[in-house]
């Protein structure tokens, strides 16, 4: 299947914003208008990508992928690699605090790398 190219909402592959550490959001700013606007923009991009059946399924999105250097991610916790999507959750200043020793391999891609895909080994379970 031929997929459409990278959405204009995403920064170009190898963009410096994808390499540098994103800024943490202070507790006092979590409910601020700017944070809400960032999340709204991310949801709009993510939902638009998920509705376009000509593209791969978007399972996660980090704010830096759309040019915003903040520690906000969206994760579709229902995505199973078989086309099931629809439960996007927002995480602010996420940290992985525990991972299982058991791993699993998945064929993955990333919207920030355009058409680069491959098999990635990850912890089977993560706790945030």
Regions found by a protein language model. Name each.
Residues 1-128:
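Positively charged
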